[in-house]
UniProtKB/Swiss-Prot annotation:
This is Phospho-N-acetylmuramoyl-pentapeptide-transferase. The lineage of its organism: Bacteria, Pseudomonadati, Pseudomonadota, Betaproteobacteria, Rhodocyclales. Its cofactor is Mg(2+). Catalyzes the initial step of the lipid cycle reactions in the biosynthesis of the cell wall peptidoglycan: transfers peptidoglycan precursor phospho-MurNAc-pentapeptide from UDP-MurNAc-pentapeptide onto the lipid carrier undecaprenyl phosphate, yielding undecaprenyl-pyrophosphoryl-MurNAc-pentapeptide, known as lipid I. InterPro entries: Glycosyl_transferase_4, PNAcMuramoyl-5peptid_Trfase, PNAcMuramoyl-5peptid_Trfase_CS. The gene is mraY.
Amino acid sequence: MLLELALWLGQDIRGFNVFGYITLRTVLAALTALAISLTAGPGVIRWLAAKKIGQAVRDDGPKSHLTKAGTPTMGGALILIAIGITILLWGDLRNAYVWVTLLVTLGFGAVGWVDDWRKVVHRDPKGLASRWKYFWTSAIALGASIFLGLSATTPAETELIVPFFKAVAYPLGVYGFIALTYFVINGTSHAVNLTDGLDGLAIMPTVMVAGALAIFAYVAGHAGFSKYLGVPYIAGAGELAVFCGAICGAGLGFLWFNAYPAEVFMGDVGALALGAALGTIAVVVRQEIVLFIMGGLFVAETLSVMVQVLYFKASGGKRIFRMAPLHHHYELSGWKETQVVVRFWIITLMLVLFGLSTLKLR
């Protein structure tokens, strides 16, 4: 809304056209979302506490987690509020990519909200039945995939880009693109959700990956930079840099309250939504493989659960890890919670920098 107002004023008043620059609006989006999170955070936490929306803790996990019982959860709603308001203020609402990403984010957040609400408020340990949880997330992801696939106007928008190799891309076709997009959005969403198990563990890697995707989005949406760096030019994709800025700002604001010892937890409402947002943005800017690299922590956490379950069933009750997801394994191996979190942050930072290097190493 502010963008449209600024551009309208810019027709008669010199200086307002500066708000048309994506770089400026990305910074403003980050600052706005950060301010909203920091300002609204205490009130949201008090409301959650008053409604007794507290975290339930498994008694078979690390004993140190027992002290977390009752900590307000569903704080991811704060992140979504900050992102939503920020995008309405600074995003280009004429851009289809902005709307697709926003609707996917809010849609996955709604599924997470219902799941959390049933678990915490209705005291249903299963929450939203798994089949319905995956049905609704799949429906949203598939809807976005079909829209993006059918609205593609150039071959570059549906090609799989291979990093580190110049001009190496595999045409997926509409159906291949839809299938890949579905798995990226849904997979990233649930991977981030599995990672969200320790104070600050999931949100900071999400911020790091979003920050890197902002750079990829800006490059992909800029005809000159995309040609110079050998990245597919996707008209309009640059606006997603503003969305990434909002994720970074909202995420850092949430981390203020989620850092150890956490005053609030994100819950499925935040984790599912943020993962879906990252997946959608990566698909639009054609960096699915790079997302796999930068989000290596999310991948490792997911694989640890899959391997643990498969091995447990195949071996008749034996386990590879002390506990899955992976962060619990290290906790039970003697690492303190803060050590696990910070070390996983460091690993993510290295992976993100490695992913960014693909812009030049071709």
